[in-house]
UniProtKB/Swiss-Prot annotation:
Short name of any one Pfam family annotated for the protein: Pou
Function of the protein: Transcription factor that binds preferentially to a variant of the octamer motif (5'-ATGATAAT-3').
Keywords: DNA-binding, Homeobox, Nucleus, Repeat, Transcription, Transcription regulation
Organism: Rattus norvegicus
Name recorded for this polypeptide: POU domain, class 6, transcription factor 1
């Protein structure tokens, strides 16, 4: 109401923390009496303090004024509850269950299902012949069994002439081109070649081999002229030492592991062996000793 001031509440530091309300007598307000006859009653508040002594609220505890007759409402209102409702603890929400699902196993191709072969995976004659229940003719009408037999006989006939794959490859390269090199001859004999390539090589190799056999019947020199190289040198037979010779050589080696040329000649004459054989024996013996000393370094005592 105008003209009425409320008492102010302050704390120990002089800070304003609230104001005390004034209660006006409702009975006097209801009458049309002049404003100066109004009765004002002071309300004595009760202060609410916290643990630190600070005022947190005020409660009015003075007697209430005389009630005024009021028409009872049609619907009773529920009295306000002054009790502080306890805070119900919220139920802990369980964490979402994690379900681990194993991936579906990959379907294994059935053993009976045929595997498609691309152009880069063309099977060789050896792979086709080695498979069980393989027809003798492939898709292009090439007789695989005939090629296999010819490759086997070609190798036997080549060795009987004393020719190597390199000699055959050099002779064919000079007359037919680089497609008939030593590597091509090697793959053909091992059947490590596609059926089409084998079918292309077969007539050329057969013609050349027949000609080489005719030249060989006329003489080894004619064959070498046809092949275009010197006769192949036979490998020298390996020399075997007797136990007495080995004992004598070891005795010489203990005295002098690196003999001079004159000393090697004298040892060879004494043991009745070729000088080159004795020289090679000393070289091999020194290399064996060197390798043995290297191994001893890594041995744990």
């Amino acid at each position: 109401m105008p003209g009425i001031s409320s008492p102010i509440l302050t704390n120990a530091q002089g800070q304003v923390i609230g104001a005390l309300p004034w209660v006006v007598n409702s009975a006097s307000v209801a009458t049309p009496a002049p404003a100066q006859s109004l009765q004002v009653q002071a309300v004595t508040p009760q202060l609410l303090l916290n643990a630190q002594g600070q005022v947190i609220a005020t409660l009015a505890s003075s007697p209430l004024p005389q009630p005024v007759a009021v028409r009872k409402p049609s619907t009773p209102e529920s009295p306000a509850k002054s009790e502080v409702q306890p805070i119900q603890p919220t139920q802990a929400v369980p964490p979402p269950a994690v379900i681990l699902t194993s991936p579906a196993p990959a379907l294994k191709p059935s053993a009976s299902a045929p595997i498609p072969i691309t152009c880069s995976e063309t099977p060789t004659v050896s792979q086709l012949v080695s498979k069980p229940h393989t027809p003798s003719l492939d898709e292009d009408g090439i007789n695989l069994e005939e090629i296999r037999e010819f490759a086997k006989n070609f190798k036997i006939r080549r060795l009987s002439l004393g020719l190597t794959q390199t000699q055959v490859g050099q002779a064919l390269t000079a007359t037919e081109g680089p497609a008939y090199s030593q590597s091509a001859i090697c793959r053909f004999e091992k059947l490590d070649i596609t059926p089409k390539s084998a079918q292309k090589l077969k007539p050329v190799l057969e013609k050349w081999l027949n000609e080489a056999e005719l030249r060989n019947q006329e003489g080894q020199q004619n064959l070498m002229e046809f092949v275009g190289g010197e006769p192949s040198k036979k490998r020298k037979r390996r020399t075997s030492f007797t136990p007495q010779a080995i004992e004598a050589l070891n005795a010489y080696f203990e005295k002098n592991p690196l003999p001079t040329g004159q000393e090697i000649t004298e040892i060879a004459k004494e043991l009745n062996y070729d000088r080159e054989v004795v020289r090679v024996w000393f070289c091999n013996r020194r290399q064996t000793l060197k390798n043995t000393s290297k191994l001893n370094v890594f041995q744990i005592p």
